Regions:
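Alpha-helical linker/hinge and terminal dimerization helices associated
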Residues: 3-4, 25-47, 257
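Short amphipathic alpha-helical coupling segments at ligand-binding clamshell hinges
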Residues: 21, 25-28, 66, 70, ...
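Flexible hinge/capping segments at coil-to-helix
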Residues: 113-152
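Hydrophobic hinge/microswitch elements
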Residues: 89-94, 98-102, 107-108, 160-218
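Central regulatory/effector-binding core of bacterial HTH transcription factors
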Residues: 51-114, 182-184
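A short LG(V/I)-centered, amphipathic sequence patch enriched
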Residues: 1-18
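Secondary-structure junction motif
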Residues: 136-137, 151-172, 239-248, 254-262
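A late-sequence structural motif
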Residues: 66, 129, 216-259
Length: 264
């Protein structure tokens, strides 16, 4: 009362009642306490994964060929968590992570170590495939120059895997000039299997077509360097309970315990 300079209570021999000013303050205080209780309940629900959101940035290819089993198991265990997937190239999903639009991002190149914590998941390898009846010799070993002379089917230039493969060939003085450029990794296999050319694909994401024999690998005289798929988080920003639990599922599959060491 002395701090506000008004009388909040009316005191009589029968007891204490609120004044008009006291009633106004009581209404605001009751609302504040109600909001505080709601906030505490929301935090408790988030901690117990009864509510919340999991936001992930990842390419559509990795979503289909890698993340689907994890997303299925996560949803079965935590059905009340809203899962939000934002698709894009590695560069794009790392931008989303850096701006806080997603909590987790899967990328196929190592980002800035000062901004992100990086956890290795698995390595990928480039192979060139064609239909079994394509006019080439699957028993022969081809040089990279000979590969570059085939009618090539590649991902569009914006894809990080396309840029990586182009760089590998450029380092050897070779330029890739594809006959067909696509936005979908899945379509690479589809067009190769009908004989439209030789497709440059990620082997680990093409096992279905390879195992079924709809396409076959060409043998290379020189192996193209592998690439690593990594899980990234914002450095010095603890993940939410929902994101942390998803990371535990990924960790159980790949065994990482700490961020990967960065070169340099």
């Amino acid at each position: 009362e002395s701090a506000l300079g008004v009388q909040l209570f009316s005191r009589t021999a029968r007891g204490v009642t609120l004044t008009a000013e006291g009633s106004v303050l009581y209404d605001y205080a009751a609302q504040a306490l109600s909001l505080l209780e709601a906030g505490e309940e929301r935090i408790a629900q988030s901690r117990e994964l009864l509510k919340g959101e999991l936001s992930i940035g990842v390419s559509s290819t990795l979503t289909k060929y890698y993340l689907l089993p994890f997303l299925r198991d996560y949803h079965q265990q935590y059905p009340h968590i809203h899962v939000r997937i934002l698709n894009g190239t590695s560069r794009r999903v790392l931008q989303l992570l850096g701006s806080g639009q997603v909590e987790l991002a899967f990328a196929t190149y190592t980002p800035d170590a000062d901004s992100f914590s990086v956890f290795p998941c698995f390595d990928t390898h480039t192979v060139f495939v064609a239909a079994p009846d394509y006019p080439c010799d699957f028993d022969r070993v081809y040089t990279l120059q000979e590969i570059s002379e085939f009618p090539l089917i590649l991902l569009e230039r914006e894809a990080s895997s396309r840029r990586f493969r182009e760089d590998c060939f450029l380092q050897r003085g070779l330029r890739l000039q594809p006959e067909i450029e696509l936005a979908s990794h899945n379509l690479l296999i589809s067009l190769a299997r009908i004989g439209l050319g030789v497709a440059g694909v990620t082997e680990e994401l093409s096992l279905s077509g390879l195992n079924r024999g709809v396409v076959r690998k060409l043998h290379l005289a020189e192996e193209i360097p592998s690439r690593r798929v990594v899980l990234c988080t914002r450095r010095n920003t603890p993940p939410s309970a929902a994101a942390g639990r998803f990371m535990e599922m990924i960790r159980a599959n790949h065994g990482f315990d700490r961020p990967a060491e960065q070169d340099g």
